[in-house]
Curated annotation (Swiss-Prot):
Biological processes annotated in GO: NAD metabolic process; NADP biosynthetic process
Cofactors (names): a divalent metal cation
Transmembrane segments: none
Protein purpose: Involved in the regulation of the intracellular balance of NAD and NADP, and is a key enzyme in the biosynthesis of NADP. Catalyzes specifically the phosphorylation on 2'-hydroxyl of the adenosine moiety of NAD to yield NADP.
InterPro entries per the UniProt record, alphabetical: ATP-NAD_kinase_N, ATP-NAD_kinase_PpnK-typ_C, NAD/diacylglycerol_kinase_sf, NADK
UniProt keyword Lipoprotein, yes or no: no
Name used for this protein in its record: NAD kinase 1
EC number: 2.7.1.23
Length: 265
């Protein structure tokens, strides 16, 4: 089996990554940064996001597992003290692969140039680079509303505990194939109205934004931030691809939610 390790880059993470590499090589595994079967992330959820975007083009062949060296992560489920146990599990234990839904983002342009396509594991956001975002919102090909405000956040179920939650969105279990649209400071008065509530769209339902012409847009996809010009539309939907995680033991989603947001530290 081929593996690679991605580290957060701090001293403790690099030390753990080096130790795991030596252990796995001793077990006869092959280090392969180009076409790994397993990607081990050592750091936090941010490190795993970087790993996902590094290998997004081979999601059917690659599975991820995380060791968190910082705060409790939603994706990184092993502690630094459990590194030897994890290595033995990888080497000797049949593992389960769990799949989570992803968000597909397609940006089309006024001048007809080639569209830009992205996959998000957590969320994608859109804001105006100059001020208030004004955009038509279409759902399933029909006009829904005209949004005016700071921006919109479109998240995956596994990303619903991140920026989406801070915006008042719902937490969605990652077994549900859906995306969620949450508003950022929408303008609502006697003249301008939005639905004013997060929207959950099931698989095969598509959301298309059609921003005001000439507006420069600041678009994020997970940790990536870009400015796009002459945007005709932005399409969001549940992606056909899924991200795959290696599981050697139960990792209950609702327990992670409770430990992160409710339980006493």
């Amino acid at each position: 089996m081929k593996f690679t390790i991605m580290s957060k880059g701090d001293q403790s993470s690099d030390t753990l990554a080096s130790t795991m590499k030596e252990y796995l090589l001793d077990f006869g595994f092959i280090m392969d940064e180009q076409e790994p079967d397993i990607v081990i992330s050592v750091g936090g959820d941010g490190t795993l996001l970087y790993a996902f975007h590094r290998y997004y083009n081979r999601l059917d062949e690659t599975a991820f597992v995380g060791v968190h060296t910082g705060h409790l992560g939603f994706y990184a489920d092993w502690l630094p003290t459990e590194v030897e146990k994890l290595v033995i599990a990888i080497a000797k234990t049949p593992f389960q692969v769990v799949e989570y839904p992803l968000l597909e983002v397609i940006i089309r342009y006024m001048n007809g140039s080639k569209e830009s396509q992205y996959l998000a594991m957590n969320e994608a956001t859109v804001k105006s680079a100059e001020g208030t975002l004004v955009t038509e919102v279409e759902i399933r090909g029909e006009y829904f509303e005209t949004f005016r405000g700071d921006g919109l956040c479109i998240s995956t179920p596994s990303g619903s505990t991140a920026y989406n939650k801070a915006l008042g969105g719902a937490i969605i279990h990652p077994s549900i194939e859906a995306i969620q649209i949450a508003e950022m400071a929408s303008i609502n008065n006697r003249v301008f109205r939005t639905v004013g509530s997060p929207l959950v769209l099931p698989k095969h339902h598509t959301c298309v934004l059609k921003p005001t012409a000439g507006m420069n847009l600041q678009i994020t996809v997970d940790h990536l931030t870009m400015v796009h010009q002459d945007v005709k539309s932005i399409q969001y939907r549940v992606a056909n691809e899924k991200v795959r995680f290696v599981r050697f033991r139960p990792f209950p989603f609702w327990k992670r939610v409770r430990d992160s947001f409710v339980a006493d530290k």
